[in-house]
Amino acid sequence: MNGLMKANALRSVIAAAAVCAAGAATAEAASPAAPAKSAEERGAWFREARFGMFIHWGVYSIPAMGEWAYAQKPWKPGEYEAFAAKFNPTRYNPREWARLAKAAGMKYAVLTSRHHDGFCMFDSHFTDYKITKSPYGRDAVREFVDAFRAEGLKVGFYHSLPDWTHPGYADKESPEFIQRGELHVPTPEQYAAFKELVFNHVRQLMTEYGKIDLLFLDYTSKYKADEDYFDRERILSMVYACQPDILVNDRLSYWKDNCRDFDYYTPEICVPNQPQKVKGRPVMWETCATINDNWGFAKDDNNWKTPEAIVAGLVGCVSRDGNLLLNVGPNELGEIPAPAVERLKAVADWFKTNGESVTGCGKSDFRPPFGCAYTQKGSVVYCHFLQPPLGDTILPGLKGKVERITLLRTGEEVGQDNVWGFELLLPDEQRIRTRGLRAGDVLKMELKKQ
């Protein structure tokens, strides 16, 4: 590096540090910062990972009605906020959570630092409505970061841009509007104070917890949904200055096409039918989904997804070049519910023998047979059976192209029949012996060198 290049690099570092460390006025004056690396460069680990753990946890675990508990009933003044004085998750063991996630094949985890109810799971410098003022008294976010990093997982924060408890925020999905049809409209001073709180909270999370790999911002408001309600350029400039390698999702605007700058797209509780594009360009994407029907702990929600459904959802995402962020909702004591643990352990059993068909894989250009999905890594195509086959399986477009087929569950080689005689095969179709296979089985198909 010559002297001029060194000087320019140093100026860039100093400028980024100034935006990151400075107060509101400095950051607001700065022009929007673009990270030095592209989203694709920063997201190499994300595309390799394919599977992550989402964790929705807060004081809403006490009423145990899900993460929107604050909006689900007409609480008396101060009634919901009083849960903070009872919040004491003495069984919170994030190292156990991390080991559970790692065994299930998850490579990263995202924790709610604050949800829409405004309660901070970290030691906020800007409000006393936080976990360090509860009987627990410790920073749950810091403990999460330390534990998951120690197990070798990437870490990220979910952070709610809305705060239903702040007078500066207006929302047609707020408790007041849902329960009484009333829309609180803040004064300009209240709105300015609210935006400052959002900015300061995000900056604290970006500066006091070491390297953060992912930021999942969330926005629910349908009030002025088409406007830049949160000063997104200001927030993005600060975030990228503080964390140059971070990935930021698409929810700084209610509608994804309004948010000019984002690194990955986040469909919710669904698997898209194809690799995703936004404004004509391919984007990294991640489906977030619940392991039952609620994000936060809900004592009456027993609609748990089966391990087979979880695996099928994961495969569906990877086969379309996407990720799955699977959510668990710990209870008020800090425990992941036993049914969720059981299912993740079952997924871990599947992953022990089949993990290579997910990690580092993406879509395949070959068309999968009936009841199957394909993932691919280099010259290896993985055939995932989403249901037990009726008998043998016909592979479209692969006749004469496969060197070897192995059942990952057993390591046994699968035979390829070129002639059967009782059906009409197209010239490019290959019949293989799959009688006795079951849902969740994966065939490793090594293609011949061309």
Language-model features: locations:
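Sec/Tat signal peptide C-region and signal peptidase I cleavage site
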Residues: 25-28
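Mature catalytic domains of secreted/periplasmic carbohydrate-active enzymes
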Residues: 30-450
